[in-house]
Amino acid sequence: MKLKPIIMAILEELHMENKFVSLKILINKLDKYKPSPRTLQSILKELIECNRVIVQGSASTTEYAINDVISNYRRFEFIYVVKDNEIAGILFKLSDRYRFYYDNEFLINKSKPIPSLDLQILPFDFNNIPAVFEENIPEGINREILETTSRTADEFQILTMLEDNIGDLSFTKTREIVKNKSSNPSYLSSLNEILGSNPKINVLKDLVVGIEDE
């Protein structure tokens, strides 16, 4: 579903209301777009199918409200993706894939999209963690240091432990954003200490280099 102005207006109105509202109220709120009941119901049906909107009641008592996407995936692991100190979306680790949804507020604000992930209502599905997120994880010795200190090689878990992120993306397990501060120790800023206390990765510990005088 393309991000048509009326779609964004529906999400914005439901977000501001933050409660169930009737079709009649929505039509009045969206008078600028002159939607017919059938057109509005069709758009709402699509938003319901992609977990953006929830519905209650039936026939003349039907009401609509903004949906917290997480409510449909509570049994799965998920992390928040932060862009420029704003919650951009949610990355879920499903049983057979990774799924990313842009956050409703991020869409409503018409914020700048994450590279390679155009703003859209529908989720993105991946077999692996998408490259735009995975590239934040260091390689080589720095990756080994991070895995050793965090005691996990799971890239999904490692994302939330990063402090030295690339660009404007970061990852967190809660919606709370702590600007320019992290509770995780920076492995790059503590490199000497980490190498000294981890013999597994301190491969040069007992190396002696002899230099002969000429």
Predicted feature locations:
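The alpha-helix within a helix-turn-helix
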Residues: 27-28
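Phosphate/dinucleotide-binding and metal-coordinating scaffold of catalytic cores
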Residues: 2-5, 18, 24, 33-39, ...
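Short amphipathic alpha-helical elements of helix-turn-helix/winged-helix folds
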Residues: 9-17
